[in-house]
């Protein structure tokens, strides 16, 4: 965090055609970022949160690792592949198909074999037993830690 606080800053006009978050993500791509931590991207205005989530998926498609946070909760866009997260035991999490995905999870209180999911609450409120592994076989998903 100290490194982020000492980073160069740009002042953006209040009235513009994109959110501050989108401007930040464009700049990150321009600078060749491999990882992005988007602070203040969750909570607050729902319209901004939804746009930031979509933009996070776009960056992930370009190979950038993205984490969104409001300081209390964290979210990670997941594309097809195997994703490992070093969670502490009892860490609560949800996996959301975004909008649909075939995915499985291991290392959770309720493991899930690869399952096609769409518009469901089945993958809400799980609990890590320790590190978890999420395999997205198709579609997109969001890992939400709370």
Predicted regions and their residues:
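Generic detector of short, locally flexible boundary/turn motifs and exposed helical patches
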Residues: 2-4, 31-33, 59-61, 69, ...
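Structural signal for conserved beta-strand scaffold positions within catalytic alpha/beta enzyme cores
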Residues: 11-13, 68, 97
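Conserved phosphate- and dinucleotide-binding cores of soluble alpha/beta proteins
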Residues: 28, 47-89
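Short beta-strand segments
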Residues: 39-41, 69, 96
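Long, charged alpha-helical interface segments
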Residues: 71-73, 78-146
């Amino acid at each position: 965090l100290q490194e982020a606080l000492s980073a160069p800053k740009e002042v953006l006009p209040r009235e513009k055609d994109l959110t501050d978050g989108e401007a930040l993500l464009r700049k990150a791509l321009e600078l060749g970022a491999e990882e992005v931590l988007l602070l203040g991207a969750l909570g607050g205005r729902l319209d901004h949160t939804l746009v930031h989530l979509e933009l996070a998926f776009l960056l992930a498609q370009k190979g950038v690792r993205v984490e969104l946070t409001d300081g209390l909760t964290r979210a990670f866009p997941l594309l097809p592949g195997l994703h490992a997260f070093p969670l502490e035991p009892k860490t609560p999490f949800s996996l959301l198909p975004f909008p649909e995905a075939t995915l499985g999870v291991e290392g959770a209180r309720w493991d899930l074999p690869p399952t096609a999911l769409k518009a469901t609450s089945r993958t809400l409120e799980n609990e890590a037993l320790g590190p978890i592994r999420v395999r997205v076989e198709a579609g997109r998903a969001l890992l939400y830690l709370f």
